[in-house]
A protein has these predicted regions:
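An acidic-aromatic pocket/loop used at catalytic or ligand-binding sites
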Residues: 1-49, 53-196
Length: 196
């Protein structure tokens, strides 16, 4: 029993180490060759939202941000990423209800932070007929761009995530102990009362 408790404690400490390792800088570095928007309609004055006008498409944008999110600044430690591809309609929930979207991907560091990357490529807009797409051309400071990329990041406080983890980890230990005791009792009952 003491060995399993020691394993539980070591695993908990390793996960705590993961939780306290610094994350990549959020917001990430600016998208190269892409002016940052200062328009109210792009960010709605949300502190955790920025937008860029760019000629880069999804195939270039997503690898750029995945590369930004791959490693911790602490000893270049590799962090696990989960990439979730959301339907474009979900952008209205993540950003605001009038957000145009062609793709919406979420880069998640489990139990730590998330970065939403929303891209609107007006020439590929699946919600608008080809003949009507020109009305949604992305123009910024007199220059026409192929797309607009909007980012939203969500961080969590390291102390809060550690407190939640240890509470859940303790509940898991208690639940597993109770489950083992119940299974053990069940087999003893079967052995003593059914099998003779």
């Amino acid at each position: 029993m003491k060995k399993s408790l020691l394993i539980w404690l070591v695993l908990g400490l390793l996960f705590t180490l993961y939780l306290i390792i610094p994350e990549p800088q959020l917001p990430p570095k600016d998208l190269p060759d892409s002016p940052k928007s200062n328009l109210n309609d792009d960010t709605r004055h949300m502190e955790d939202v920025i937008a860029y006008y760019t000629n880069r498409y999804r195939a270039e944008v997503m690898p750029y941000y995945l590369d930004q999110m791959d490693n911790s600044p602490f000893l270049n430690f590799a962090l696990p990423n989960i990439v979730i591809n959301h339907p474009p309609e979900f952008a209205e929930t993540v950003f605001f209800d009038t957000k145009q979207s062609y793709y919406l991907e979420e880069i998640v560091h489990p139990f730590k932070s998330t970065l939403f990357v929303n891209g609107y490529e007006w020439e590929n807009d699946v919600f608008t007929s080809k003949s009507s797409r020109r009305q949604y051309v992305q123009e910024f400071e007199g220059v026409v761009y192929n797309s607009k990329v909007t980012l939203r990041w969500i961080n969590s406080n390291p102390l809060i995530r550690i407190a939640i983890f240890w509470a859940a980890w303790g509940i898991l230990l208690t639940t597993v102990k109770m489950l083992i005791a119940e299974i053990s009792y069940f087999f003893r009952f079967i052995k003593n009362n059914v099998i003779k």
